[in-house]
Amino acid sequence: MKTLLLSLVVVTIVCLDLGYTLTCLICPEKYCNKVHTCLNGEKICFKKYDQRKLLGKRYIRGCADTCPVRKPREIVECCSTDKCNH
């Protein structure tokens, strides 16, 4: 019985994902569904876009270790849950 219990504990530990990796969206379109697994240490999803009236909005999405710095005429949104940068 102890052997069975020990085997179940070992299988459970091996099958569990003990680490957590953030996933963020990464496409340049307004509506996005391409998912990217962030690197270790990247704990932020971001979405940047600028307000160019003639050319429309240009989107940049991805993972980062900190929220990117905003440039003039640019909007930056940051979040920290999976696929939150929609």
UniProtKB/Swiss-Prot annotation:
Tissue/organ expression: Expressed by the venom gland.
Keywords associated with the record: Acetylcholine receptor inhibiting toxin, Disulfide bond, Ion channel impairing toxin, Neurotoxin, Postsynaptic neurotoxin, Secreted, Signal, Toxin
Domain of life of the source: Eukaryota
Subcellular location: Secreted
Signal peptide: 1-21
Family, similarity comment: Belongs to the three-finger toxin family. Ancestral subfamily. Orphan group II sub-subfamily.
Cited function: Binds with low affinity to muscular (alpha-1-beta-1-delta-epsilon/CHRNA1-CHRNB1-CHRND-CHRNE) and very low affinity to neuronal (alpha-7/CHRNA7) nicotinic acetylcholine receptor (nAChR).
UniProt name for this protein: Probable weak neurotoxin NNAM1
The species this protein was found in: Naja atra (Chinese cobra)
